[in-house]
């Protein structure tokens, strides 16, 4: 089956309904090679399949994918989830986190403006970062993340993979750091799917009760969503 070009993908479906923007910010540096990147690819692709079994979530969810190693790449701009193509990410290179975080912030800001111009009410967007490495100097971009969260513009949290730099992720996300035990991303991406479903049956601005985390992920996240 031939892949669609981005020009063939509608910018939004059901514009009269509230919409949710979810951006996956994914570390594809060399240390993610082998089982980690293979599991991540399979789990991202399964996430799309799971979301699309629920008509309501499919209707309101737009997803973007940004990867980073020593460079930042927008693998997929914000796209209605039903139009996601399978990913086949390849791990290589070093880790430079700050530029990728800034790209993610800019994309979320632009998506929020797009919703406003379309007359679409937005849910608070999520940036979900997955990383196993040391990200370099993130002090400046961390301040931007904290300010945007404090102002109520987004939720930014991260999943640390085996060997991750805890100090870096906590500097960026505060308490909103999850820890993955092992390299199986299936459970956490299923959690993301169920979280999007919980958002989809809420009203924008309403506190959402999130599902329990999978057994191989540590942290209780519900206090983050006040």
Regions picked out by a protein language model, each given a short descriptive name:
Residues 1-23, 28-38, 52, 112-117:
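Acidic, polar low-complexity linker/tail segments
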């Amino acid at each position: 089956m031939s892949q669609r070009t981005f020009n063939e993908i509608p910018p939004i479906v059901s514009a009269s309904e509230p919409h949710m923007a979810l951006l996956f910010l994914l570390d594809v540096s060399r240390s993610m090679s082998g089982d980690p990147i293979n599991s991540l690819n399979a789990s991202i692709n399964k996430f799309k399949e799971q979301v699309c079994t629920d008509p309501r979530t499919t209707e309101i969810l737009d997803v973007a994918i940004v990867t980073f190693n020593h460079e930042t790449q927008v693998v997929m701009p914000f796209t209605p989830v039903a139009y996601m193509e399978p990913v086949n990410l390849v791990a290589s290179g070093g880790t430079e986190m700050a530029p990728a975080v800034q790209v993610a912030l800019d994309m979320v800001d632009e998506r929020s403006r797009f919703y406003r111009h379309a007359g679409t009410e937005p849910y608070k967007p999520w940036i979900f970062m997955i990383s196993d490495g040391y990200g370099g100097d993130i002090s400046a971009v961390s301040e931007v993340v904290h300010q945007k969260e404090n102002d109520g513009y987004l939720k930014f949290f991260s999943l640390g993979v085996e060997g991750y730099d805890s100090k870096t992720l906590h500097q960026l996300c505060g308490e909103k750091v999850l820890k993955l035990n092992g390299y199986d991303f299936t459970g956490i991406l299923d959690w993301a799917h169920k979280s999007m479903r919980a958002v989809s049956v809420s009203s924008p601005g309403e506190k959402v009760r999130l599902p329990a985390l999978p057994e191989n992920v540590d942290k209780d996240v519900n206090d983050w969503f006040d």
